[in-house]
Amino acid sequence: MTAPKNSIDLSQYGIDDVNEVVYNPSYELLFSEETKAGLEGFDKGIVTELGAVNVDTGIFTGRSPKDKYIVRDDVTRDTVWWSDQGKNDNKAMTPETWDHLKGLVTTQLSGQRLFVVDTFCGADEATRLKVRFITQVAWQAHFVKNMFIRPTDAELENYEPDFVVMNGAKTVNDKWEEQGLNSENFVAFNLTEKIQLIGGTWYGGEMKKGMFSMMNYYLPLQGIASMHCSANVGEDGDTAIFFGLSGTGKTTLSTDPKRQLIGDDEHGWDDNGVFNFEGGCYAKTINLSKENEPDIYNAIRRDALLENVTVDANGKIDFDDNSKTENTRVSYPIHHIDNIVKPVSRAGHAKKVIFLTADAFGVLPPVAKLTPEQTEYYFLSGFTAKLAGTERGITEPTPTFSSCFGAAFLSLHPTQYAEVLHKRMDDAGAEAYLVNTGWNGTGKRISIKATRAIIDAILDGSIDNAETETVPFFNLEVPKVIAGVEGDILDPRNTYEDPSVWNDKAVDLAKRFVNNFDKFTDTDNGKALVAAGPQL
């Protein structure tokens, strides 16, 4: 709908002389706005053969973590996990620099025709953030309408935002060098003013992950777990959550015909159970096929929004083309997936917590049941590894340790998330499992068929009745038999012709875990957890 010019007062944010406010536009209006004649550059959307619109985000095909800042003031000084306290993206900004950036964005938005989209972040009424997005660009309004929870007309009647996001993608900061910033682009947060500013980057994910970072600030301080995970629920109301970094299988494994999807990326866990932060999904589309991922493929239709996908003049899509980026994406409202929890994306307490890792070293077992102490250790470690090509063409593993499986989005110290998750799991009697979707001694990746059989065994409880053995160095308890899984792969040592090769690799990986975890040993709790990790 188009709001009367004065019905939403944007001057309270420093935006003046607004030409017109297009308030909470319908999908029909957004479609016509983002594809209308006369649009140029990154404003322009292209209609594809599947009915979804495709947009180009320019050189910004992913987040810009080096351009992320939080104003250091009385609110944040003693709570935020600052980049000078540990390796993270929470760089401090002065209030003076903030004022300058805010002036740039409000000047850019003043005098323009603007889209204002009011949303909820969080499916729990008591703790959700009411987030208002202000942008010049129709498809950016479309993106947040897809990704956040869409309020009803009744909920909009007395809507007062808790947080405001001003997207000034068309402005840059020429004074960045003298201000000691990383570049002319910026993604900045002020927790006193409760505003996020975006400048220079057109990437839609900055709005999504920006609010995730804010939920990661507010919820743990209230004793609520804030998690980078997918979640689903079975017919008996048994909730499962899947932690994992990009490429480990979060979205694929939580999309299960036997279970209803709660959400695919961001969740909270409070006194009532697990709830989604979002109203949509943001899926990778590189090499997407209808055969391999039918749910995601079928979600790409009218109202979905593709980003940086190769589309020809006739609207034909080439999902295999990575010439623009590997990080091609689609956002769509969650109701584009059939098998979802309705009407609200929430369910009861989790009974099964799964940590997904893709171990390219070929060391970790396909599955291990974790003790409470191991759960905290592996959660804080947040390990995965990728195979990266070297100059000589040899592929060698590159380890990634990302605390809580989402260090890029943590606003507080990682131990705060670990403590809250530990309490939630303890109260619910939940059990944790480490599931490796990576490689073993055969040089091949563990098949998705085997991994799905493992997930089934975790969810139906049969894994808990299996006879087990212990993998050395890591002291992980692994089952000897799981239905549907070749028995010899469950102990990774069996996948090597020469078990001493596994030993050497295991020692190497164990050392990497130990070295990474050293940063947590500055507290008594961290020191106590060392015994739960690999022992050399």
Swiss-Prot record:
Purpose: Involved in the gluconeogenesis. Catalyzes the conversion of oxaloacetate (OAA) to phosphoenolpyruvate (PEP) through direct phosphoryl transfer between the nucleoside triphosphate and OAA.
Primary localization class, coarse: cytoplasm
Gene Ontology CC: one annotated term: cytosol
Binding-site residues for substrate, renumbered to this chain: R63, Y203, K209, R329
Manganese keyword on record: yes
Lineage: Bacteria, Pseudomonadati, Pseudomonadota, Gammaproteobacteria, Alteromonadales
UniProt entry tagged with the keyword Metal-binding: yes
Pathway where it operates: Carbohydrate biosynthesis; gluconeogenesis
PROSITE patterns from the UniProt entry: PEPCK_ATP (PS00532)
EC number assigned by the record: 4.1.1.49
Alphabetized InterPro entries for the sequence: PEP_carboxykinase_ATP, PEP_carboxykinase_C, PEP_carboxykinase_N, PEPCK_ATP_CS
Quaternary structure annotation from Swiss-Prot or TrEMBL: Monomer.
HAMAP family documented for this protein: PEPCK_ATP
Binding site for Mn(2+): K209, H228, D265
GO MF assignments: ATP binding; metal ion binding; phosphoenolpyruvate carboxykinase (ATP) activity
Name of the protein in its database record: Phosphoenolpyruvate carboxykinase (ATP)
Cofactor note: Binds 1 Mn(2+) ion per subunit.
Domain of life: Bacteria
Gene Ontology process terms (BP): gluconeogenesis
Family named by the database record: Belongs to the phosphoenolpyruvate carboxykinase (ATP) family.
Catalytic activity: oxaloacetate + ATP = phosphoenolpyruvate + ADP + CO2
PANTHER family, per the entry: PHOSPHOENOLPYRUVATE CARBOXYKINASE (ATP), PHOSPHOENOLPYRUVATE CARBOXYKINASE ATP
Keywords: ATP-binding, Cytoplasm, Decarboxylase, Gluconeogenesis, Lyase, Manganese, Metal-binding, Nucleotide-binding
Gene: pckA
Cofactor(s) for this UniProt protein: Mn(2+)
Localization terms from the record: Cytoplasm
Pfam families: PEPCK_ATP (PF01293)
